[in-house]
């Protein structure tokens, strides 16, 4: 099987997670500056066998997409142009940052480490992907 890549898109930084080849477990991969994201994903897909890309869909509590969607849509269009055969799906990302902070607390990370926004973004991408993998198994 191939891997699945998840993206927690941000204006400055973007967290990236990847599944194992059996598509059971999500692991944080890295956080990259958003302006380097398209090249990073393109290179990763060339090096690894990737089945699809999951993008965190920023929704508000009232179920409407948030302001950040205006930044995500142009990226997704560029991604689809560069990788036309790669399926791209959106997955609701509500509460992933809150869950990421909770995960860091439960893991016993020190306050300084919990304030590392790049780590929060990477963990958020991991939560998005793990949620997708679990939903897919149902």
Curated annotation (Swiss-Prot):
InterPro entries: RNaseH-like_sf, YqgF, YqgF/RNaseH-like_dom, YqgF/RNaseH-like_dom_sf. It is found in: Cytoplasm. GO terms for biological process: rRNA 5'-end processing. The keyword Coiled coil does not apply. Keywords: Cytoplasm, Hydrolase, Nuclease, Ribosome biogenesis. It is an enzyme of class 3 (hydrolase). Its main location: cytoplasm. SUPFAM superfamilies: Ribonuclease H-like. One of its GO terms (molecular function) is nuclease activity. Belongs to the YqgF nuclease family. This is Putative pre-16S rRNA nuclease. It comes from Bacteroides fragilis (strain ATCC 25285 / DSM 2151 / CCUG 4856 / JCM 11019 / LMG 10263 / NCTC 9343 / Onslow / VPI 2553 / EN-2).
């Amino acid at each position: 099987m191939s891997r699945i890549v998840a993206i927690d898109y941000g204006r400055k930084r973007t967290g990236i997670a990847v599944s194992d080849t059996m598509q059971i477990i999500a692991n944080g991969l890295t956080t990259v500056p958003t302006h380097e994201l398209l090249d990073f994903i393109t290179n990763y897909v060339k090096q690894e066998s990737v089945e699809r890309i999951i993008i965190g869909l920023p929704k508000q509590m009232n179920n409407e997409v948030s302001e950040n969607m205006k930044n995500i849509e142009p990226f997704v269009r560029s991604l689809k142009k560069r990788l036309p055969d790669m399926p791209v799906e959106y997955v609701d990302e509500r509460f992933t940052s809150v869950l990421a902070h909770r995960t860091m607390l439960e893991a016993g990370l020190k306050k300084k480490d919990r304030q590392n926004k790049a780590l929060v973004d990477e963990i958020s991408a991991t939560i998005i992907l793990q949620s997708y993998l679990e939903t897919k198994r149902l």
